[in-house]
């Protein structure tokens, strides 16, 4: 039985949270000030190590190797990546054939 069909969806009876463990993920994060002003854009990559009730744990590779990074548990935000070499604009690193990509916007709270 195939684990994934061509659309990237899990095969019948296989939960997506199980399928993504061990998969290579590129994470894009854009940070904004509380007023919507752009701060910075970061890109990270690594392998999914666990899917928790509220988060997904990713063991980062490359310049951030060894760090565990958590993203919200929204499996719909994990998009099947097309095969190829991806260049991370923020670091210049090359990632070959990632399994998934995901993008997040983070708005910082106003200062106290």
Whereabouts are the PLM-identified features?
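Short beta-rich binding modules
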Residues: 1-112
